[in-house]
Amino acid sequence: EKAYKELGTVTAIMAGCVILAVLPNAQNMYAQWDLGQNSIRGATELTTTTPSGEKISSGLDKDYAFAWSYGKGELLTLLVPNAYGGSSGGMLGPDSELYKELRAKGAQVGKEVQAPTYWGEKTFTSGPVYFGALVCFLFVLGMFVIRNPLKWWLFGGSVFLILLALGRNFDSFNDFMFHYLPMYNKFRTVEMALVIPGMVFPIIAIWGLKEVLSETVSDALLKKGLIAALA
């Protein structure tokens, strides 16, 4: 009975927090919802057929929604920002080979030259999603030294959202999610799902660092975490 009482109390507190968080933004949220009903993300009187043969009557079609799917290899940019070249309009300085070649050919260039440095599979991009090398290092360390089981909920949620960001690059999973996960077919780009892991990683990183600095972590566990983080 005590456990049920505690569960009820925690649930009530969480529900109250959700309500308090929503109320200040209720007007903006309603305006966004109302606008969405009359946009390409809303319902339509017509049923359209996508190039892949899928029939839709509400939300974005799958081909359009998955156009900016994050590549599996591109997940490396979470750790190394320019692993896939950067952006479609990157700036190259005098030290780059392209800049030197343009100057050698007599091209009029300034201190920098703009060029499509991105070489991933998206049509174009303004830049990669980057969490930070230090944050990623501390995140892995934190997963080892944090003893609170809450870390697994944060980790699992992050993995789930990263999989959503892959879009068509993990189609066996995301095809189901596109049709049955509420609001997923209304995302501007599926890679926007990386926003939440981008906040969770620093939380785990700081939490883990706190555990280390509090000197409550055994040397063996700390060593194991450091080896995994460096790997």
Question: Where are each of the predicted segments found?
Answer:
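Hydrophobic alpha-helical membrane-insertion segments
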Residues: V18-N28, S69-S88, W152-L166, A228-A231
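Membrane-interfacial segments
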Residues: G36-I40, T44, R147, L181, ...
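Periplasmic/ER-lumenal interhelical loops and adjacent helix-loop junctions
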Residues: Q27-G142
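Hydrophobic alpha-helical membrane-interfacial segments at the cytosolic entry of transmembrane helices
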Residues: K5-W33, T48-I56, V159-F160, K224-A231
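Hydrophobic alpha-helical scaffolding
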Residues: K5-I13, C17-V22, D61-F66, S126-V129, ...
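Transmembrane alpha-helical segments
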Residues: C136-M143, F201-L213
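Membrane-helix boundary/interfacial segments in multi-pass membrane proteins
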Residues: P116-V129, F160-V200, L213
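Membrane-interface helix-loop-helix junctions at transmembrane boundaries of multi-pass membrane enzymes
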Residues: K2-V10, K100-V113, L138-R168, V217-I227
